[in-house]
């Protein structure tokens, strides 16, 4: 797939990347639109230690689901990834999950963003 990759401070490279792997319980999304957020700009300028190159930025994403229950449906991605196991997640307060992360971030774990043809 083609993706716009943050490769260095103030440097983005349009290049071929591997398609995202299917993750149990998630869908592969064919990206139709992806916004550029202020936090993406902070990363671009080297001002966000949670986003380190190389990384596909972009966490404001919509597109068409390619698999699963939502196959062929238009979807808007919730960029928040929570553990679904802690007391906050079990009480529908995923935004407080101590293990949470987001797409388009490299810390606490790498999860590629939506400035690409596909996202998981």
Annotate each language-model stretch with its function.
Residues 20-34, 47-90:
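Glycine-rich beta-strand-centered segment in the early N-terminal region that forms part
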Residues 8-10, 23:
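Residue-level recognition of beta-strand termini and adjacent short loop/turns
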Residues 18-19, 52-58, 106-111, 117:
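Short Gly/Pro-enriched turn/cap motifs at secondary-structure boundaries
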Residues 1-2:
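Extreme N-terminal starter segment of soluble prokaryotic enzymes
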Residues 39-45:
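Cytochrome P450 core scaffold surrounding the K-helix E-X-X-R motif
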Residues 83-120:
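NAD(P)H dinucleotide-binding glycine-rich loop of Rossmann-like/cofactor-binding domains
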Residues 10-14, 38-39:
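Short N-terminal binding/cap micro-motifs at the start of the first secondary-structure element
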């Amino acid at each position: 797939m083609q993706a716009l990759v943050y490769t260095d401070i103030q440097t983005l490279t349009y290049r071929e990347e591997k398609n995202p792997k299917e993750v149990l319980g998630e869908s592969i999304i064919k990206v139709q639109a992806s916004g550029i957020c202020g936090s993406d700009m902070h990363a671009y300028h080297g001002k966000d230690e949670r986003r380190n190159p190389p990384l596909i930025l972009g966490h404001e994403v919509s597109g068409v689901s390619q698999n699963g229950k939502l196959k062929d449906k238009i979807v808007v991605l919730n960029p928040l990834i929570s553990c679904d196991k802690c007391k906050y997640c079990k009480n529908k307060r995923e935004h407080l999950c101590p293990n949470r992360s987001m797409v388009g971030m490299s810390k606490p774990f790498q999860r590629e963003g939506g400035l690409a043809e596909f996202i998981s």
